[in-house]
Amino acid sequence: MSMKPLGGSMASAEPEGDIADPGSLDPELLGFMCGIEIHQQLATGKLHSRQSGMLYDYTIDTIPEDWPRAQRRLRASEGEAGKIDVAARFEAKRNRSFIYVKSPNAGLIELDEAPPLSHDSDAVDISLTVVAMMGMNPVPVMQAMRKTVVDGSNTSGFQRTTLIATGGQVETPSGVVRISLLTLEEDSARKLDTQSNSDGEVVIYTLDRLGVPLIEIATEPDIKNPEHAKECSRALGQILRDTRKVRRG
């Protein structure tokens, strides 16, 4: 059986250059293949509740003691296919419980005690603006999907994600990078601390960040080298900043 380079781009099976000096190696001759995925918080209200998207800069030592707290355990259950997710089963065996600190911008939806509301209209508008800036194709219907999250950072046990558009591209000095998809999803709760007691491990989260909208952008593996990856990241970041409606640290 013979081995051929992918796409015929590699001249030989051995790297050309000094392997002790990675900077001297040609990424394309090595068969370098790269795509990137980025997440950007939006400066809006929460995605599926009408709560404020304000973030509180508290630590486990400074968070107000009078903020309500709820303690939960996540239980692995069967999905639509009638099977229990392997990661969920593993997490259940860790015997961890979770304490959620209810910030002023957290309500019944953040506590998973009420059904989610429709998408925040401002978050959708910003997403569609970015879609237009990259020449993407919006989907005809927005349908929230559920991604299993078993580390306790989502009170419901899953993250709501909505596909907004596919296709499109971004221009860089080293060439065009195709965009695979853009989704709109919820950020997770913020972890404050992990403690141990006689009953096992207790993880403490605050709910201020849970539900804040995130734009997720994924590219195709068109990036040619590390410098090209930097250019692509910068181009995507500039597009998002040009909306004037994203959060910046």
Language-model segments: residues:
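Basic, nucleic-acid-interacting segments
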Residues: 2-249
